[in-house]
Structures are given as structure tokens and as C-alpha cells.
């Protein structure tokens, strides 16, 4: 899989943190997020899923994720926003790759990306959450275009 290394700015995000199998929690989180964004008329330009664990190591029922939207740095969570938390996604060096997801198979492009990055002779993965930014509305288009982000650091020799 083709990817590039680039410097990424810190993002302020608001949304929901969930624990459980990602196949269920990400969908549930975005349903909650959509209701909250529409109900509060939140202006955003990015919809993001943040993944905190390695699904090959952590049991499915303990996998953590956040479904969030990017918001201005001075954003204040409106009243009556139960369950919504404000947080940041660290900036820094990231490997980024774009993929098209069909049949809701988000894991295949992620595994391809991780496998490609593992072969890199200049960078290694940093111990930070990974995330994906949605580039289209897959609910209406039947597929998802996503940009995947994995934090990296120079390879220690």
C-alpha cells in the first residue's frame, strides 16, 4: 500500500468514547455523533474514528475507540450534551494512506497499511492512537473513502 510520511497538526475533537467490538461500537458511536451534531447544529469539517488498541492483542470486548468531529480549539461543549467529551488528537509525524472501503471491511486496508509500514527502513510506528478521517458519506454512496493515520518516529538503530 502506498503511503506518505507527513507532519500533521494537533486536532481538537468532540464526540463519544466507547468500549467493545469495533464492528458495533464505531457504528453506534457515529449514530450518536450524528444526532448530537445535527441536534446542536455543530459546524465541523472532519468526521473521525480514533482507535486506541491493537485488535490482535486486546479482546474485542475491551477495544477502545472514539467517534468524533473536529472542532475549533476554543470549542465549548454545549449544555445537555450527555456523554460528549472534548479531547485532542496529537500532532506530529504520521504515515498517511487513502483507501476505499467496501462491504464495511475496514480491517483489510488497515492491515495492508500496517504491513506496508512495518517494511519501512526509515520510520517505525509510535505508541499513539491511530485514526481515520472519512472523506465521503458511505451511508449514501455505498462505500467509504478514508484517510488512515499512524503515528511514526524515526527508526532507532
Swiss-Prot record:
GO terms for molecular function: DNA topoisomerase type II (double strand cut, ATP-hydrolyzing) inhibitor activity. Its main location: cytoplasm. The keyword Chloroplast does not apply. It is found in: Cytoplasm. It comes from the Bacteria. Keywords: Cytoplasm, Stress response. Transmembrane segments: none annotated. GO terms for cellular component: cytoplasm. Belongs to the DNA gyrase inhibitor family. Interacts with DNA gyrase. Inhibits the supercoiling activity of DNA gyrase. Acts by inhibiting DNA gyrase at an early step, prior to (or at the step of) binding of DNA by the gyrase. It protects cells against toxins that target DNA gyrase, by inhibiting activity of these toxins and reducing the formation of lethal double-strand breaks in the cell. This is DNA gyrase inhibitor.
